[in-house]
Amino acid sequence: VGILIGVFFGTLIGAFNGLVVSRTTIPAFIVTLAAMNIGRGIARIYTHAQTIAVLDDAYTFWGMGEILGLPIQLYLIIAVIIVSSFILNRTKLGRHIYAVGGNKTAAEYSGINVKKVTFFVFAFSGFLASLAGVLTVGRTFTATMIMGDSAEMDAIAAVVLGGTSMSGGKGSISGTVIGVIVIGILKNGMNLLGIDSSWQYVVQGIVILIAVYIDFIKSGGT
């Protein structure tokens, strides 16, 4: 039940963000940043800034369980990759997502319901973010108000390294997977080398800047 509630509210928050972004002129970055801070504030109030232990076997199974000797998280990751790739590459909705990302005005003139597409993207993002949160809690056996801090930077770095254009309209699931692997190797490598966490943030920021600059050059400097 706790898993379903967590995923439900995550999807609901994503849907709310999508509703605000699609119905107003407020930049998506501002809306999601505000929602993130509201969520963290609610988490602090609810937990009283304390760490909550999660020891229920049915819950932790999704974080630490195995099927045929492989982590259940691996199966879920593969399922998300397949579903997301299918939506983007094999459906009309996927083509509309690329079109809206590339040029919202042109998409509107071509008859695409930009508001519905935007709403879906944010709701689906909320669903995936909440699913990741549930799996993280199941893996660490704890829930804290700071869980997920800086995860947004990991996500930005991964998608940019994977070839997603910051100007929109370009990107792929396979490229993002490669970006995630690269960021994972980079972070694990720095941990193994004993690099201070503060410097790890510096390195990650530099990587993002380089990736964005390369994207800027590839797009013709526009």
Protein language model regions, located:
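Cytosolic-side transmembrane-helix boundaries in multi-pass membrane proteins
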Residues: 82, 109-116, 188-222
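Membrane-interface helix caps of multi-pass small-molecule transporters
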Residues: 12-23, 42-45, 86, 90, ...
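Transmembrane alpha-helical segments in multi-pass inner-membrane proteins
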Residues: 14, 129, 139-204
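Membrane-helix interface residues
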Residues: 24-26, 91, 112, 171, ...
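Helix-loop-helix "hairpin" substructures at the membrane interface of multi-pass membrane proteins
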Residues: 1-6, 12-17, 68-143
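Alpha-helical transmembrane segments within multi-pass membrane transporters and channels
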Residues: 1-36, 178-179
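Hydrophobic core segments of alpha-helical transmembrane domains in multi-pass membrane transport
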Residues: 7-10, 36, 40, 76-87, ...
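Transmembrane helix-bundle core of multi-pass membrane transporters
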Residues: 24, 28-91, 117-120, 139-148, ...
